[in-house]
Amino acid sequence: MAAKIRRDDEVIVLTGKDKGKRGKVKNVLSSGKIIVEGINLVKKHQKPVPALNQPGGIVEKEAALQISNVALFNSATGKADRVGFRFEDGKKVRFFKSNSETIK
């Protein structure tokens, strides 16, 4: 099945503490979750690793979000938008449902 949201897409968060924030997709996980740059930041307590010369401490990093809690951001309309699929020149492409613009 083709993915509606892919790596490097710009998405907007629909629900949760980061509602309304936009970010770029860093990673799409097979469990139906995604990691977005600068969104859903959590503090992780990390032990030092002397063998790798890594200091310990509290590190802030991005946690995964459910893919259903984000939508693709349409820069033409400035809003979140739904994604559809169609065939153009024998290739399956994604498009925004509001204005039928093809997604690059």
From Swiss-Prot:
Organism: Erwinia tasmaniensis (strain DSM 17950 / CFBP 7177 / CIP 109463 / NCPPB 4357 / Et1/99)
Quaternary context: Part of the 50S ribosomal subunit.
Function comment: One of two assembly initiator proteins, it binds directly to the 5'-end of the 23S rRNA, where it nucleates assembly of the 50S subunit. One of the proteins that surrounds the polypeptide exit tunnel on the outside of the subunit.
Name of encoding gene: rplX
This protein's GO CC annotations: ribonucleoprotein complex; ribosome
Database matches in Gene3D superfamilies: 2.30.30.30
GO biological process: translation
Top-rank lineage group of the source organism: Bacteria
NCBIfam families in the record: rplX_bact (TIGR01079)
Pfam families given in the database record: KOW (PF00467), ribosomal_L24 (PF17136)
Single GO term (MF): structural constituent of ribosome
Keyword entries, A-Z: Ribonucleoprotein, Ribosomal protein, RNA-binding, rRNA-binding
UniProt name for this protein: Large ribosomal subunit protein uL24
Similarity comment: Belongs to the universal ribosomal protein uL24 family.
Database matches in InterPro entries: KOW, Rib_uL2_dom2, Ribosomal_uL24, Ribosomal_uL24_CS, Ribosomal_uL24_KOW, Translation_prot_SH3-like_sf
